[in-house]
Amino acid sequence: MAPSWRFFVCFLLWGGTELCSPQPVWQDEGQRLRPSKPPTVMVECQEAQLVVIVSKDLFGTGKLIRPADLSLGPAKCEPLVSQDTDAVVRFEVGLHECGSSLQVTDDALVYSTFLRHDPRPAGNLSILRTNRAEVPIECHYPRQGNVSSWAILPTWVPFRTTVFSEEKLVFSLRLMEENWSAEKMTPTFQLGDRAHLQAQVHTGSHVPLRLFVDHCVATLTPDWNTSPSHTIVDFHGCLVDGLTEASSAFKAPRPGPETLQFTVDVFHFANDSRNTIYITCHLKVTPADRVPDQLNKACSFSKSSNRWSPVEGPAVICRCCHKGQCGTPSLSRKLSMPKRQSAPRSRRHVTDEADVTVGPLIFLGKTSDHGVEGSTSSPTSVMVGLGLATVVTLTLATIVLGVPRRRRAAAHLVCPVSASQ
């Protein structure tokens, strides 16, 4: 029997309810056993096009959505024509169509788009029975190896970035439980909570290294060049979010030189109905025996002492955080530059740093702009009748399957979504 994989799918309801449970997928000698509940969204990353199949019972409640309320990508591409009796809605678009974005990394081509459910009142009614929902979609195509058609194997990955460098350095950024003992399985928060973030580099057989968080920014989408944005870490390791009323800070001492932990008081952007946040950080490493300096540091602001203090190293390295003059232009100026694609860094430093993203962080209890008349405050009513998902989060696991060399790359990757787990 071939190995089995398990991944998590969460439906997050705007009213503060979360439906989340492990969804098993097995494979036995090439035969896939379907989960007990049919998936509501299926995605196929093919050689030149993207196929998205959506169940009309999108939220698993028995209330069917209208195909006209579904669209794909920023260009709002419409689905294929379907009959009223059809149980699914189907999209078939080219990888470059519908406003999809392409990101080129060192080892992959990443096409990103989203499925949107945007309900409109039916007829002369002024009420809505469902709310908006948005499903991020990504297709990853490896750049390495033979470029013939059968060599491309698209894969789904969870939107918790892990970056592999050429010298086998693996950078990661993860949400952790409050006691730091394990990774947080559900990215949901109430306003007033504190997010625990852990940046880490796995060095393998590399010489000992010390990890630093150079800068971090929070945005509403995975693209850190978008607006609005909020800077969390800047000036080569100054946790500037702690200057506000927040208590955000780096954790000292470190668990080890290759790990850096910090907390961020959760927030949402005013005047925006979305309740999701993505955090992107630029991570870098130095030799573990090098003394931290102004360009390589981890500094937190203490309101009680009204001063900056480092996780390690002399206190003088944090003085530049006060004026924001720590050697090079700040993050705010970097963000105004065009998005980086493949490489303006020199080959000497390409393995020393990486951009990693964690998200989305979901903030429960934030009122949606799309109200429902006649709603009640009962949690049961919110779950069953009126609090349908405005944001749908897919946590997707990378499944690497060995296929015969003659097989075409149009790998059919199924990502089930279910709200009834």
Curated annotation (Swiss-Prot):
Major localization class: membrane
Q: Which domain of life is it from?
A: Eukaryota
Q: Where in or outside the cell is it found? A: Cell membrane
InterPro entries this protein is in? ZP-C (IPR055355), ZP-C_dom (IPR042235), ZP-N (IPR055356), ZP_chr (IPR048290), ZP_dom (IPR001507), ZP_dom_CS (IPR017977)
Q: Which UniProt keywords apply?
A: Cell membrane, Cleavage on pair of basic residues, Disulfide bond, Extracellular matrix, Fertilization, Glycoprotein, Membrane, Pyrrolidone carboxylic acid, Receptor, Secreted, Signal, Transmembrane, Transmembrane helix
What post-translational changes are documented for it?
Answer: Proteolytically cleaved before the transmembrane segment to yield the secreted ectodomain incorporated in the zona pellucida.
Transmembrane annotation, as ranges: 382-402
Membrane association type? Single-pass type I membrane protein
Q: Which residues are glycosylated?
A: 124, 146, 155, 161-162, 179, 271
A GO molecular-function descriptor: receptor ligand activity
Q: Could you tell me which cysteines form disulfide bridges? A: 45-139, 77-98, 216-281, 238-299
Record-level GO BP terms: binding of sperm to zona pellucida; blastocyst formation; egg coat formation; humoral immune response mediated by circulating immunoglobulin; negative regulation of binding of sperm to zona pellucida; negative regulation of DNA-templated transcription; oocyte development; positive regulation of acrosomal vesicle exocytosis
One GO CC term on file:
egg coat
- Ranges where the ZP domain occurs: 44-306
Modified residue Pyrrolidone carboxylic acid is at which positions? Answer: 23
Please list where the region (Disordered) is annotated.
331-351
What is stated about domains? The ZP domain is involved in the polymerization of the ZP proteins to form the zona pellucida.
Protein role: Component of the zona pellucida, an extracellular matrix surrounding oocytes which mediates sperm binding, induction of the acrosome reaction and prevents post-fertilization polyspermy. The zona pellucida is composed of 3 to 4 glycoproteins, ZP1, ZP2, ZP3, and ZP4. ZP3 is essential for zona matrix formation. May not have a sperm-binding activity by itself but may increase sperm-binding activity of ZPB.
Whom does it interact with, and what assembly results? Polymers of ZP2 and ZP3 organized into long filaments cross-linked by ZP1 homodimers. Interacts with ZP1 and ZP2.
What's the family? Answer: Belongs to the ZP domain family. ZPC subfamily.
Question: What protein am I looking at?
Answer: Zona pellucida sperm-binding protein 3
Protein's gene? ZP3
